[in-house]
Swiss-Prot record:
One of its GO terms (molecular function) is glycine binding. Keywords: Oxidoreductase, Pyridoxal phosphate. Its cofactor is pyridoxal 5'-phosphate. The modification N6-(pyridoxal phosphate)lysine is found at K708. It comes from the Bacteria. It catalyses: N(6)-[(R)-lipoyl]-L-lysyl-[glycine-cleavage complex H protein] + glycine + H(+) = N(6)-[(R)-S(8)-aminomethyldihydrolipoyl]-L-lysyl-[glycine-cleavage complex H protein] + CO2. This is Glycine dehydrogenase (decarboxylating). The glycine cleavage system is composed of four proteins: P, T, L and H. Disulfide bonds: none annotated. Gene3D superfamilies: Aspartate Aminotransferase, domain 1, Type I PLP-dependent aspartate aminotransferase-like (Major domain). It comes from Pectobacterium carotovorum subsp. carotovorum (strain PC1).
Length: 956
């Protein structure tokens, strides 16, 4: 039959590529679960009173090429000026071998946080490299595997300083007056909720205040000056005051390590190591401390341990400090950090090595010296006599200078009184320096780069001798071996091959939404129009970004039912914090500052209580009933008891137990009745989009995990984006920014991230996803996520009981498999099943959350029936193996489950097990075989023998 042109054009082709099951597969799966259609299934599962009467107005789907063309036109409105603004952001030259083999490689960007170390050894090694770089450059004993950005790291440093301080009565934190303004902004915000007083002044004035528990210094100062803080930090140490230093990672290549000068905590942005500015992010922050403070440190830490065979293996160490275990008592609410960006920065150091980094840093400094010499020769006055890469130049008519710079396509720092700032970088050329001479001295400046270069050799050093680094850096072989592109490419490939990511198999982690990150969505993040903009450039140069953010915000308003979106939070945890801050500030604006109690169901994710504590709230736990639902009687009692102290409730929907609670609107009404606000955690938005919205349900604020629901990849543990949606009454109280004004936000509202729009350069991913799916496609995605979960639950429920179900025995987009009865009867645990799945070629589901002894499975809409059946068949085969243990065919201490996973090395070694080699390593055939590089990790050994630096190459 002849098809029409409209039929052949088929605008919805991307929807069919994003959604895994074909139409025929969907029909089969519906028949298995006992539903006639997707709409009928949703009617059985989602409470009728919260289902949307009409679809969200986000438009129809565009094809991949149409969406890319639209976004390219929007990106073209951004103007790519040379930005010498500095303030913690610099242009970079990302090595193409890293761009191609890491940033554009799904083996790196689709992986999850390495909770399962046996399938994560590649990126764990990459993160260990990053930690080694941090330790070497900071001169401290222990480093984390990244934080969200430099300003957030500063706030974490302040919080840590208070935790480790022996001055328990001190409540003041001193900040030197040459710290970056955006850093001070975020520190003030955090101090507000902790009840700390921020004191700003000259660094030496810190000694004048006896009530200070910690001090924040900056090396290099925001205006470019270098400091020798050795004497100051020695004096502070004598008074038991904690010294924190924000550092420039490139400058540290040449400068004395702050740890050697006496700093207790050192942090900064790793952006300069190969990561584009991206209008503010994402960028990894580095963070280091002294060994005696290791248990007070925030963020992930990678440690060296051993596996069951006694071989060296890596894992996340000291997890008991973190929110998923300690909840409101955690060191931080940080969950996702910036792993992909930390890996890029670490690999930048691996590729260039110590000598290459010294050349890069030395060239930047030399060009700065040449620029300084020329400007001085031309009659201009510099504010400082020492510098690394940044000059502050006195000018008579600042506006005229800035205007002339713009005419040259150049941005200078503009917020300094009677002066302009210039920060050079690795992308700066000789021609760029000549252009700066022309801007500041006129076209007839007559200066010659070569002559200036020769002349400055005879002048005083602009890095004082006492600040020059004397010790070696990056002496480990990993930083001295892979300097040819061939070797680097192979090293990156070897690491990626050790990991299990979405490019090999589904990752059925509950509460994580490991869906497709389509190639068309990823392409725009490498476009220079998005990658090269400075976050503090003039707004008229970022019209494309502003348009894209405005469109995306408009779509998210429709999809959430809220009135406004704040894009600043650069992780889900930051979104929670920002949303709770908005609630806190709203209450304060109504003279109800006494509202400090936050109700949280016992099933909540660990970030919820950790974020509430960070926002200055006290947590009251609400019970759940036997079905996993919020106990309304307990909620009503606790809301009533809280009375005028009730601030809010934090609730996840569908619940963390994987069901749509029928009484969610009543929950909202009860909290509102007692004057509280409803924070609806957006972790499970993938089961809401197009079906219902938080606003329609009755919530006041939510964060959205764009790295889950809206297709930004997890990157092995970051980047993330956690924008918040708010009702109109909360909109004035979302985070502001002291450097870049944000429309509609009260100017006094402090920031939660360094950049005004968070990790703006990954927002095109979510823009592309929504544009290519349209309203109907987004609804189908939610429906298919729900169908896939119910299909798994139906097929597995006889082998593994589904712990919680809703109406008609249905689950939402994820299901919890109860392993506890099996463990009681056979001794086989959820851990054994998780590790045995590796032999079948799968990443494990989420273990023991939200209920100990369970596995939580979330398939997402992107997995086909073929892949889901492969997972189900693996789980059923494992159940049969458990039966063989129960029947005594295999002993409890020697069977394929407790010995899992099995490695290639074990396959060729002597074999004394009561099961065959083939069953061990090819339980489901060889087509989808994944080979783990290590056996099961020894967690106890790793924490008892903490070692968080690179190990000898012979150990790998």
């Amino acid at each position: 039959m002849t098809q029409t042109l409209s039929q052949l054009e088929h605008d919805g082709a991307f929807i069919e590529r994003h959604i895994g099951p074909s139409v025929s597969q969907q029909q089969h799966m519906l028949s298995v679960v006992g539903a006639t259609s997707l709409d009928a299934l949703i009617r059985q599962i989602v409470p009728q009173d919260i289902q949307l009467p009409s679809p969200p107005a986000v438009g129809e789907a565009a094809t991949e090429h149409e969406a890319l063309s639209e976004l390219k036109a929007i990106a073209g409105r951004n103007q790519r000026y040379k930005s010498y603004i500095g303030m913690g952001y610099s242009a970079v030259l990302m090595p193409p071998v890293i761009l191609r083999n890491v940033l554009e490689n799904p083996g790196w960007y689709t992986a999850y946080t390495p909770y399962q170390p046996e399938v994560s050894q590649g990126r764990l090694e990459a993160l260990l490299n990053f930690q080694q770089v941090t330790q070497d450059l900071t001169g401290l004993d222990l480093a984390s595997a990244s934080l969200l950005d430099e300003a957030t790291a500063a706030a974490e440093a302040m919080a840590m300083a208070k935790r480790i301080s022996k001055l328990k009565q001190a409540e003041r934190f001193f900040v030197a007056d040459d710290v970056h303004p955006q850093t001070l902004d975020v520190v003030r915000t955090r101090a507000e909720t902790f009840g700390f007083e921020i004191v700003v002044g000259k660094a030496e004035d810190a000694l004048k205040d006896d009530a200070v528990f910690g001090v924040l210094l900056q090396q290099v100062g925001t205006t470019g000056e270098l400091h020798d803080y050795s004497d100051l930090m020695a004096a502070l140490k004598a008074r038991k005051v904690v010294s924190c230093v924000a550092s420039d990672i490139m400058a540290l290549v040449l400068l004395t390590a702050p740890g050697k000068q006496g700093a207790d905590i050192v942090f900064g942005s790793a952006q300069r190591f190969g990561v584009p500015m991206g209008y503010g992010g994402p960028h990894a922050a580095f963070f280091a401390c002294r060994d005696e403070h290791k248990r007070a440190m925030p963020g992930r830490i990678i440690g060296v341990s051993r596996d069951a065979a006694g071989n060296t293996a890596l894992r996340m160490a000291m997890q008991t400090r973190e929110q998923h275990i300690r909840r409101e008592k955690a060191n931080s609410n940080i969950c996702t950090s910036q792993v992909l960006l930390a890996n890029i920065a670490g690999m930048y150091a691996v590729f260039h090595g110590p000598e290459g980094l010294k050349r890069i840093a030395g060239r930047i400094h030399r060009l700065t010296d040449i620029l300084a010499a020329g400007l001085t020769q031309g009659g201009l006055l510099l504010r400082h006599r020492s510098w690394f890469d940044t000059l502050t130049i006195e000018v008579a008519d600042k506006d005229a200078v800035l205007s002339r710079a713009l005419s040259f396509g150049i941005n200078l720092r503009s917020d300094l009184a009677s002066a302009v700032g210039i920060t050079l970088d690795e992308a700066t050329t000789r021609e760029d320096v000549l252009a700066l001479f022309a801007v500041l001295l006129g076209d007839d400046h007559g200066l010659d780069i070569g002559a200036l270069d020769a002349a400055i050799s005879q002048q005083a050093a602009t890095i004082p001798a006492g600040l020059l680094r004397q010790d070696a850096i990056l002496s480990h072989p990993v930083f001295n071996r892979y300097h040819s592109e061939t070797e680097m490419m192979r090293y990156l490939h070897r690491l990626a091959r050790k990991d299990l990511a979405l490019n090999q198999a589904m990752i059925p982690l509950g509460s994580c939404t490991m869906k497709l990150n389509a190639a068309a969505e990823m392409l725009p993040i490498t476009w220079p129009e998005f990658a090269e903009l400075h976050p503090f450039c003039p707004p008229e140069q970022a019209l494309g970004y502003r348009q894209m953010i405005e469109q995306l915000s408009g779509w998210l308003v429709q999809l959430t039912g809220y009135d406004a979106i704040c894009m600043q939070p650069n992780s889900g945890a930051q979104g929670e914090y920002a949303g709770l801050l908005a609630i806190r500030r709203y209450h304060e604006s109504r003279n109800e500052a006494g509202r400090h109690l936050c109700l949280i169901p016992s099933s909540a994710h660990g970030t919820n209580p950790a974020s509430a504590q960070m926002a200055g709230m006290d947590v009251v736990v609400v019970a759940c009933d036997k079905q996993g639902n919020i106990d309304l009687h307990d909620l009503r009692e606790k809301a009533q008891a809280a009375g005028e102290q009730l601030s809010c409730i934090m609730v996840t929907y569908p619940s963390t137990h994987g069901v749509y609670e029928e009484t969610i609107r009543e929950v909202c009404q009860i909290v509102h009745q007692y004057g509280g606000q409803v924070y609806l955690d957006g972790a499970n938005m993938n089961a809401q989009v197009g079906i219902t919205t938080p606003g329609y349900i009755g919530a006041d604020v939510s964060h959205l995990n764009l790295h889950k629901t809206f297709c930004i990849p997890h990157g092995g543990g970051g980047p993330g984006m956690g924008p918040i949606g708010v009702k109109a009454h909360l909109a004035p109280f979302v985070p502001g920014h002291q450097v870049v004004k944000i429309d509609g936000v009260l100017t006094e509202q402090g920031a939660v991230s360094a950049a005004p729009f968070g990790s703006a350069s990954i927002l095109p991913i979510s823009w592309m996803y929504i544009r290519m799916m349209g309203a109907e496609g987004l609804k189908q995605a939610s429906q298919m996520a729900i169908l896939n979960a119910n299909y798994i639950a139906t097929r597995l429920q006889q082998a593994y009981p589904v712990l919680y179900t809703g109406r008609d025995g249905r689950v939402a987009h994820e299901c919890i498999l109860d392993i506890r009865p099996l463990k009681e009867s056979t001794g086989i645990s959820e851990m054994d099943i998780a590790k045995r799945l590796i032999d079948y070629g799968f990443h494990a589901p989420t273990m023991s959350f939200p209920v100990a002894g369970t596995l939580m499975v979330e398939p997402t809409e992107s997995e086909s029936q073929v892949e889901i059946d492969r997972f189900v068949d693996a789980m059923l085969a494992i159940r049969a193996e458990i039966n063989r243990v129960a029947q005594g065919e295999w002993p409890l201490d020697d069977n394929p489950l407790v010995n899992a996973p099995h490695t290639q090395a074990e396959l060729v070694a002597d074999w004394a097990h009561p099961y065959s080699r083939e069953l061990a390593v090819f339980p489901a055939g060889s087509e989808h075989k994944y080979w783990p590089s290590v056996k099961r990790l020894d967690d106890v050994y790793g924490d008892r023998n903490l070692f968080c630096s690179c190990v000898p190459m012979s150990d790998y």
